[in-house]
Amino acid sequence: FLINIPSKYTNNTSYNTARRHLNVLVNYLHEHGFDIQKSTLKTRKQNETLHKPINDVKGLLDEVYCFNKNLHLCCLLTYCCLLRPHQEIRRLKWSDFSEDLKTISLSGSKVKSKRNRVVPVPLYVRELLIKGEPHHNIFTHATRPLNKDYFKTVWSRFKRVSKLLEQDQTL
């Protein structure tokens, strides 16, 4: 019975997630005396896709700037500060920046690794920042951040109209 449950997944990542959850449950029941065989579900290899390098990063960033200034700032923070766009950048507040805007301090509750991070901000990124109220989001200029799919949606729209971005390229 348990072997058939994950077979509905064609995506290897989804299969491995379901397999991991099932293994925990089945192995717990087995260890606590239930008449059930230990799980023998094996992991599936996840497919890796290699993105093509971007030859003209400055040209692409200029094109992004003309398309959407929020997306441009997000791309700069992703590319130059190595922040993650969908959580770390989208939820940035001015209080996360130092007074001189030279560093961004992120607490462990705001980052995937759960570790505190202090990230330097290059001069060309600082020149685009206009400091606002400490409790305000850097994109919305209000207390609420953009919705969680905002940058994904804007990036998808940009990819459709971009003249420089090729298939399998991303920042």
Q: PLM ranges: what are they?
A:
Residues 122-169:
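Active-site/catalytic core of tyrosine-dependent DNA strand-transfer enzymes
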Residues 91-129:
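Conserved tyrosine-mediated DNA breakage-rejoining catalytic core shared by Y-recombinases
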Residues 3, 23, 27, 58-65, ...:
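Amphipathic, well-packed alpha-helical segments that form the structural scaffold of globular domains
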Residues 12-16, 31, 36, 40-86, ...:
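Basic, Lys/Arg- and aromatic-enriched nucleic-acid-binding interface segment
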Residues 3, 62, 90-91, 99:
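Phosphate-coordinating loops and pocket residues in cytosolic domains that bind phosphorylated ligands
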